[in-house]
From Swiss-Prot:
Protein activity control: Inhibited by iodoacetate. Appears to be regulated by the fur protein, but this effect is not mediated at the transcriptional level.
Provenance organism: Helicobacter pylori (strain ATCC 700392 / 26695)
Protein name: Formamidase
pH-activity relationship: Optimum pH is 6.
Similarity comment: Belongs to the carbon-nitrogen hydrolase superfamily. Aliphatic amidase family.
Effect of residue 166 to S/A: Loss of activity
EC number(s) from the headed UniProt entry: 3.5.1.49
Lineage start: Bacteria, Pseudomonadati, Campylobacterota, Epsilonproteobacteria, Campylobacterales
HAMAP family in the cross-refs: Formamidase
Biological process per Gene Ontology, one example term: putrescine biosynthetic process from arginine
Catalytic activity annotation: formamide + H2O = formate + NH4(+)
GO molecular function: formamidase activity; N-carbamoylputrescine amidase activity
Leftover remarks: Asp-168 is probably not involved in the catalytic mechanism, but is probably involved instead in maintenance of the structural integrity of the amidase.
Domain CN hydrolase: 14-260
């Protein structure tokens, strides 16, 4: 449910705060350091204003910004773990909260492009989840495709947390993967501009409904002299309804109460529309246990490495050249 300005911890759930961080204008490493200081200051201020909050979420690109002319340069990249994540860890430990942070991560393989990474830090200051974006926003983003799968970790109030990053949320199979591994609160951190505002709202709701899990999503807000970033933090119930919807204001704090046990109970007790179960047990009324092979061609082809669309040979954009990226692969933009 919506927090109605609640400041206390709910009895059987937890209070979450999603920060509509102003889109950073970043031109130097000093600007990144300033962003980190601002994020830490905001984390402490949010905890002071909402003493019962247990999870604070910052959007994609809030640490390093979106300067596309420099975002691949060594000056702009960070390591995970690294001294910057240690600062975030110290803040979470001091505030006694879980925190979600965005990092453009230097690839350990210097011959490959960087990763777009999200981390969850617990109240003890430990990184308990590290996720690398599986589906960069092609053809704009130059990030290397993630290699850590979709991890799930324990969170506050009986939650099992997973994080997706921006365009990942448009891939329904990824939300299903998180739920299949036990996630009941699916976090989405984004740096979208207004072109996909409606689709953002739609997919946050559909990811919740299709998988009987809460979704908590937050986007950058404000104007960076090129695009406007819409903010609109959103918390969705496991039945796909919107519990809380933010506005387009930079610095808006979107809060809500989440009860993971309710999602767990729905998964255990629902018959109608328990679709995450039905996928692997279709027709279980007529056939005891149901049919376990979903019979979906694209799943079989994907598993076999043969995924190909009927119109794929005629597609006009299949690389990053429209944005000036080379098409030869390998590390570029140093």
């Amino acid at each position: 449910m919506g927090s109605i300005g609640s400041m206390g911890k709910p009895i059987e759930g937890f209070l979450v705060a999603a920060i509509q961080f102003p889109v950073p204008i970043v031109n130097s490493r000093k600007d990144i350091d300033h962003n980190i200081e601002s994020i830490i200051r905001t984390l402490h201020a949010t905890k002071a204003g909402y003493p019962g909050v247990e999870l604070i979420i910052f959007p994609e690109y809030s640490t390093q910004g979106l300067n596309t002319a420099k975002w691949l340069s060594e000056e702009f990249l960070l390591d995970v773990p690294g001294k910057e994540t240690e600062l975030y860890a110290k803040a979470c430990k001091e505030a006694k909260v879980y925190g979600v942070f965005s990092i453009m991560e230097r690839n350990p393989d210097s011959n490959k492009n960087p990763y777009n990474t999200a981390i969850i830090i617990d109240p003890q200051g430990e990184i308990i989840l590290k996720y690398r974006k599986l589906f960069p926003w092609n053809p704009i983003e130059p990030w290397y495709p993630g290699d850590l799968g979709m991890p799930v970790c324990e969170g506050p109030g009986g939650s099992k947390l997973a994080v997706c990053i921006c365009h990942d949320g448009m891939i329904p199979e990824l939300a299903r993967e998180a739920a299949y591994k036990g996630c009941n609160v699916y976090i989405r951190i984004s740096g979208y501009s207004t072109q996909v505002n409606d689709q953002w709202i739609l997919t946050n709701r559909s990811n919740a409904w299709h998988n009987l899990m809460y979704t908590v999503s937050v986007n950058l807000a404000g104007y960076d002299n090129v695009f406007y970033y819409f903010g609109e933090g959103q918390i969705c119930n496991f039945d796909g309804t919107t519990l809380v919807q933010g506005h387009r204001n930079p610095w808006e704090i979107v809060t809500g109460e989440i009860y993971p046990k309710m999602a767990d109970n729905a998964r255990l007790s629902w018959g109608l529309e328990n679709n995450i179960y039905n996928l692997g047990h279709r027709g279980y009324v007529a056939k005891p246990g149901g049919e376990h092979d979903a019979g979906l061609t694209y799943i079989k082809d994907l598993a076999a490495g043969k995924y190909k669309l009927p119109w794929e040979d005629h597609m006009k954009i299949k690389d990053g050249s429209i944005y000036g990226y080379p098409t030869t692969g390998g590390r570029f933009g140093k």
